[in-house]
C-alpha cells in the first residue's frame, strides 16, 4: 500500500509542477495580451493593411485571394512572383509547374482597382524586364512595390524595374534589437540599397525598432501577423504596414481602437 502511495506521489507531483507552470505561463500571456490590447494606437498616417496571398481562406496566388483581400478592406494585396515556361511571369511561391495565374491577369485585375496597391513578393528576379513592361502596359507603376528583395537582388530591380520601389527583406536578429549600433548597421544597409523600407518577420519587431527606423526615414513592413495576440502586439509597435492572412480582423481591430464605426 505504501509503495503504491509512493508511486502515485511520484506521478502526481511532477504533473502538479507542470500544471502550475502552465498556469503561470498562461497568466503571463494573458497579462501581455491585455497590455497590448489596451496600448494606445500610434500608427503612421500612411499605415496600410496588406492581404497576404491566400487570405480569407482562398487559394494562395489566386485572383480570388486578391478579390477577397480587396473585399475585406485591405488597401494592399500581396502575391508571389515567379517565372514559368518561356520566363513568363506568374504568381507562384515555388518553381512553376503550369496552370498558374499569370502576372498579366493579376495586373489586369489591379488596373480595375486604382486605389489598391500590390506587394509583389519576388521569389525570383529572372525576368524582371517582363514585369516592368507589364507595369507600363497597364500603367501600374505607382500601385506596385516589391518585397522579398535581398541585397543580391537590388541591382536587377534597379536595372529592370527602376520605377517600382522595393522593401529590403532583412532577417532581423531578435536578440540584438536593443543594440543601437546593430540597428544603425541595418538602417545603413537599407538606405545604401536604395530601398524605401525594411520588410521583416513579426518575431523581431518592437516599438523601439520601428521608431528608430522611422527616424531614419525608413518604412517598416511586418509580415505573418495572423493571430489576435500578434495583431495587437505588432500594432503597438506602430509599423507602416502589416501583412496578414486575416485582413478583415486586423482592420476591425484598427477601427475599434480608432473609434471608427
Where are these regions (language model features)?
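Phosphate-group recognition and catalysis centered on beta-loop-alpha active-site segments
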Residues: 2-261
Amino acid at each position: 500500500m505504501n509503495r503504491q502511495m509512493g508511486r502515485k506521489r511520484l506521478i502526481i507531483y511532477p504533473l502538479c509542477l507542470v500544471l502550475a507552470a502552465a498556469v503561470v505561463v498562461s497568466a503571463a500571456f494573458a497579462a501581455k495580451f491585455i497590455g497590448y490590447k489596451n496600448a494606445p494606437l500610434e500608427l503612421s498616417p500612411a499605415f496600410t493593411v496588406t492581404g497576404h496571398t491566400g487570405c480569407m481562406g482562398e487559394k494562395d496566388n489566386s485572383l480570388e485571394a486578391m478579390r477577397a483581400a480587396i473585399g475585406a478592406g485591405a488597401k494592399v494585396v500581396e502575391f508571389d512572383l515567379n517565372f514559368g515556361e518561356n520566363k513568363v511571369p506568374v504568381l507562384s511561391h515555388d518553381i512553376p509547374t503550369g496552370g498558374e495565374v499569370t502576372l498579366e491577369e493579376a495586373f489586369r485585375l489591379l488596373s480595375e482597382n486604382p486605389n489598391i496597391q500590390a506587394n509583389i513578393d519576388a521569389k525570383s528576379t529572372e525576368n524582371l524586364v517582363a514585369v516592368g513592361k507589364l507595369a507600363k502596359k497597364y500603367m501600374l507603376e505607382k500601385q506596385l512595390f516589391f518585397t522579398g528583395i535581398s541585397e543580391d537582388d537590388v541591382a536587377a530591380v534597379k536595372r529592370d524595374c527602376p520605377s517600382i520601389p522595393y522593401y529590403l527583406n532583412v532577417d532581423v536578429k531578435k536578440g540584438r534589437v536593443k543594440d543601437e549600433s546593430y540597428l544603425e548597421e541595418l538602417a545603413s544597409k537599407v538606405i545604401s540599397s536604395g530601398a524605401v523600407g525594411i520588410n521583416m518577420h513579426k518575431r523581431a519587431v518592437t516599438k523601439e525598432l520601428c521608431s528608430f527606423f522611422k527616424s531614419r526615414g525608413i518604412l517598416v513592413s511586418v509580415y505573418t501577423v495572423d493571430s489576435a495576440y500578434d495583431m495587437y502586439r505588432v500594432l503597438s509597435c506602430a509599423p507602416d504596414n502589416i501583412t496578414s492572412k486575416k485582413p478583415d480582423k486586423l482592420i476591425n481591430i484598427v477601427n475599434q481602437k480608432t473609434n471608427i464605426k
